[in-house]
Regions:
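Mobile "lid/hinge" segments at catalytic clefts and subdomain interfaces of large enzymes
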Residues: 1-18
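Iron-sulfur-cluster electron-transfer modules
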Residues: 15-193, 198-239
Length: 239
């Protein structure tokens, strides 16, 4: 279904032509399901139709009425449980190696056995000793920069985050890795999340909480004109 078809289906739902369920209509959800949220339609369409936002609103209303599945919650809350799950990396990674476990996981969670899970690592970016300078140091530095490390690069592809840190430091920058508690720069302070996983599951209110937390943390740096560097386009575009 093309963007125009999805938009027409949404119009039918809003006008009541798909029944009394409105935005919580299963037919509307099916029409929106294949939208990947790339925002290409908003960028390229002459009328600026933002289908990605419409999909999120549809998910929000549908899930508010029909409830969230275990699959929804596993995706949405990944940033919150990733730190704990990483400790069990050896066990969790068996799912990708044993087909029977993949099928069992699909039965329990709803996540397809035909797709591999991200590889967990017991050692990741957020529990490494070297994570840049403190907030106070970067605010007074000659060449300051703030690095926003997202959940996926922090836990699943730590080499990307480590490489970004090394490149910035090699360029002469004082790098601060933003965290929930800005009193230091240790791993236990908690990493920041843009809320993208919650949006993908229709949990708009939870996504808003994380977005506010991220913006409030980064605001002091932005007000000083300090550059904020991110690694994951989806996370940056969510802001």
């Amino acid at each position: 279904l093309l963007t125009r078809g999805r938009a027409n289906t949404l119009r039918l739902a809003l006008s009541g032509q798909l029944g009394a369920e409105g935005l919580s209509n299963p037919e509307l959800l099916a029409a929106m399901d294949l939208c990947v949220g790339c925002k290409g339609c908003k960028r390229d369409c002459p009328t600026g139709v933002d289908m990605a936002r419409m999909k999120i609103e549809t998910l929000h209303h549908y899930k508010a009425r029909h409830g969230f599945t275990l699959k929804d919650r596993l995706i949405a809350y990944l940033p919150r449980y990733a730190r704990h799950a990483a400790r069990w990396s050896g066990l969790l990674n068996l799912r990708n190696k044993i087909p029977q476990l993949a099928k069992l996981a699909e039965y329990v969670s709803g996540l397809s056995a035909q797709r591999s899970w991200p590889t967990w690592h017991n050692t990741h970016f957020f529990n490494q000793a070297t994570q840049g300078v403190t907030k106070e140091a970067v605010l007074s530095a000659h060449k300051p920069v703030v690095l926003f490390v997202d959940t996926f690069n922090g836990y699943f592809e730590s080499s990307n985050a480590q490489a970004a840190l090394r490149v910035l430091q090699a360029a002469g920058y004082s790098v601060h890795v933003a965290s929930k508690t800005e009193g230091g720069h240790g791993a236990n302070k908690g990493h920041l999340c843009c809320g993208r996983t919650f949006l993908a599951s229709g949990m708009v209110d939870k996504a808003r909480e994380h977005a506010h937390e991220l913006i409030n943390t980064l605001l002091p740096f932005a007000e000083r004109g300090i550059a904020i560097v991110g690694l994951e386009p989806s996370c940056l575009l969510t802001l």
